[in-house]
Amino acid sequence: MKNLILLLIPFITFSQVDVPDKYWLDDSSFDSAISGTSAFGDDNTETIVVEFWAKFNEANCLAEWQEIKNAKYYRVDIAKAPKAKKEYRIRMAPTILILKNGSVEKAFKAGLDLLLPTDLAEIQETINEINQASNF
């Protein structure tokens, strides 16, 4: 059993960090990606999920990020976005913020154990609640 676990660790870790470049934000792209307006000045009412990530804790990131529905997903390497990290008071990674119109609606912050503080079902439920509330 121990050998099987050791054999699977590299595959699990790889799948968790296999996020295409277009989903990664740094300080130069963060504000425009999460702001409440688009490049054309239109209101952007899409819900946005931002995961603050750290290389030292990549095993605890959101592996199922592709399954998020009705929201845009971005990942931020805290080493490459110190301004965003400071602005949103990110102390531990992973931390997941759910934003609407540029404002944080919900935050899931890791504790001292550095474990992902939520799961996909809770994130999706929060997204659905935020989207429903904004339909009125």
Predicted regions and their residues:
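Sec-dependent N-terminal signal peptides
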Residues: 3-13
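N-terminal post-signal-peptidase region of extra-cytosolic proteins
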Residues: 34-36, 78-83
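Solvent-exposed loop/turn segments at secondary-structure junctions
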Residues: 55-58, 80-83, 103-105
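Local sequence-structure signature of Cys/Sec-based thiol-disulfide redox active-site neighborhoods
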Residues: 23-69
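Active-site-proximal beta-strand/loop segments in catalytic clefts of secreted hydrolases
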Residues: 52-55, 77-79, 111
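Non-catalytic, surface beta->alpha helical segment in thiol-disulfide oxidoreductase systems
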Residues: 98-136
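Cleaved targeting-peptide boundary
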Residues: 16-23
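Structural micro-motif
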Residues: 88-100
